[in-house]
């Protein structure tokens, strides 16, 4: 298991960032939502990490609040964005001082026990202003990455079930839209592909680590292309929640 403060984690994460369009695609998709908001007073980034996503949108809002319980990551965020209001608490105990026009939780639910997902989603929505939107981003359950997790550990991250439970509980109070947006990791060789796979497999706490050979064989069988590259689908689900009734998938 990687330590998020360790060099191995940083190196693997950087290789992932250098070889994927996932973050760029997410910023593009989110920007379209931000552009259509009726007000841009407050932005809450829940699970803000080191502030990379926060930075992309903070300038569009009069006030930005970042929630990040990892003090190492929070320090990086505060250095990069000194004007942001930082809350060093988990989502369930944080109490933001204002309702937000955008509540964003991007790729954070992996690190939350799944039996707490519904409570976290409810908490995020409670911070939303009457005309605002809550957005949760997570990898789609059918991506190449999730297939790999399932192959080695029998597990997938599936946000849709939590959304269905939320809708069942809230009935017609909220308008919910689920959109899947394509993204890919594209590496030039097996060494970098393995580093990315190792990073992705560490989304789960591993009791029994698969061997390097087993992971490399899986990469060869599932992600190697004819030109010798490795392409791993990492499509993202975007859940939009607003006040209102009806829901749809796209």
Where are these regions (language model features)?
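A conserved beta-strand element that flanks and buttresses the S-adenosyl-L-methionine
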Residues: 104
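Class I SAM-dependent methyltransferase SAM/SAH-binding core
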Residues: 49-93
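Conserved class I S-adenosyl-L-methionine
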Residues: 1-38, 40-49, 133-158
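Short alpha-helix
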Residues: 156-171
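Conserved Class I S-adenosyl-L-methionine
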Residues: 175-248
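A short, conserved alpha-helix within the catalytic core of class I
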Residues: 112-123
């Amino acid at each position: 298991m990687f330590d998020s403060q360790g060099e191995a984690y940083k190196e693997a994460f950087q290789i992932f960032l250098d070889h994927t369009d996932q973050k760029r695609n997410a910023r593009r998709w989110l920007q379209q939502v931000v552009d259509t908001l009726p007000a841009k007073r407050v932005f809450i980034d829940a699970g803000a990490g080191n502030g990379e996503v926060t930075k992309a949108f903070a300038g569009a809002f009069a006030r930005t609040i970042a929630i990040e319980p990892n003090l190492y990551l929070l320090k990086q965020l505060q250095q990069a964005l000194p004007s942001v209001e930082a809350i060093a608490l988990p989502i369930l105990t944080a109490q933001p001082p204002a309702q937000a026009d955008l509540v964003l939780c991007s790729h954070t639910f992996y690190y939350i026990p799944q039996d707490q997902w519904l409570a976290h989603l409810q908490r995020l929505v409670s911070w939303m202003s009457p005309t605002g939107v809550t957005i949760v981003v997570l990898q789609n359950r059918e991506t190449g990455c999730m297939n790999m997790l399932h192959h080695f550990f029998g597990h997938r991250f599936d946000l849709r079930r939590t959304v269905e439970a939320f809708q069942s509980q809230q009935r017609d109070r909220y308008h919910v839209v689920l959109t899947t947006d394509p993204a890919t990791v594209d590496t030039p060789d097996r060494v970098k592909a393995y580093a990315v796979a190792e990073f992705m497999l560490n989304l789960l706490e591993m009791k029994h680590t698969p061997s390097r050979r087993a992971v490399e064989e899986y990469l060869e069988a599932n992600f190697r292309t004819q030109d010798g590259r490795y392409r791993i689908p990492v499509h993202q689900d975007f859940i939009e929640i607003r006040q209102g009734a009806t829901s749809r998938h796209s």
